[in-house]
Amino acid sequence: GSAWSWMHAHPRPCCTLEQLKELIAWGDVIGAQKDDCSSQCIVYEVLASDVPGTFSLGGDLKLFVDLIRAGNREALLHYAVTCCDFLYEFSTHTKRPESMSISLVQGDALGGGFEGALAADVLIAERGTLMGFPEIKFDLFPGMGALTFLSRRVGVDRAYRMILSGNRYTAEQLHDWGVVDILAIPGEGVETVNAFI
């Protein structure tokens, strides 16, 4: 079977601390079922968004600014570690070694949102969606796995160039380069995932 997580961060479609905790809890629930397949084993974990036109815009920049202004290093570190915890578990399946992760990108995936999409075993994106790492444009870097996840798909040289450019790329470009595994027709992403499963 499959388990779908539909991201719906509020008030902005970014990686809020609440959303990250929910995603980790989602993985824990699936992991707890691995020894009891009496009803149906979860083989596929699908990460998607129900925000039209957006997968995820990445890190919660408002939270960053608020915590930096308040000098709250501990809370900022907690946020960063929580991001890493989710991406690590989603990409390695330590609690669910028999499962496969799928990211369905039906809208923009930027920064940490793109990292989340890249963390999956299979990245399915609708044509015309945009993905990239804009962090360099405001003197940051994507530090939650971007280089590792991207270099596995395109090599270290192209990964560095993509990260340092700050550019956004279409799903079609990324498919040509091997970043996106499967292209879907706009509006048919769910059907494409189900056909893959």
Question: Could you describe each region identified by the protein language model?
Answer:
Residues 1-46:
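Conserved CoA-thioester-binding segment of acyl-CoA-metabolizing enzymes
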Residues 1-6, 10, 167-197:
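Amphipathic alpha-helical segments at domain termini/boundaries
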Residues 47, 60, 116-118, 174:
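Hydrophobic/aromatic residues within transmembrane alpha-helices
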Residues 48-54:
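Short glycine-enriched loops at secondary-structure junctions
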Residues 61-105:
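An acidic, glycine-rich surface segment that forms the CoA-thioester-binding/catalytic face
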Residues 90-138:
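Glycine-rich beta-to-alpha active-site loop
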Residues 121-122, 161, 182:
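Well-ordered beta-strand positions
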Residues 147-157:
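Hydrophobic, secondary-structure "cap" segments at the distal end of domains
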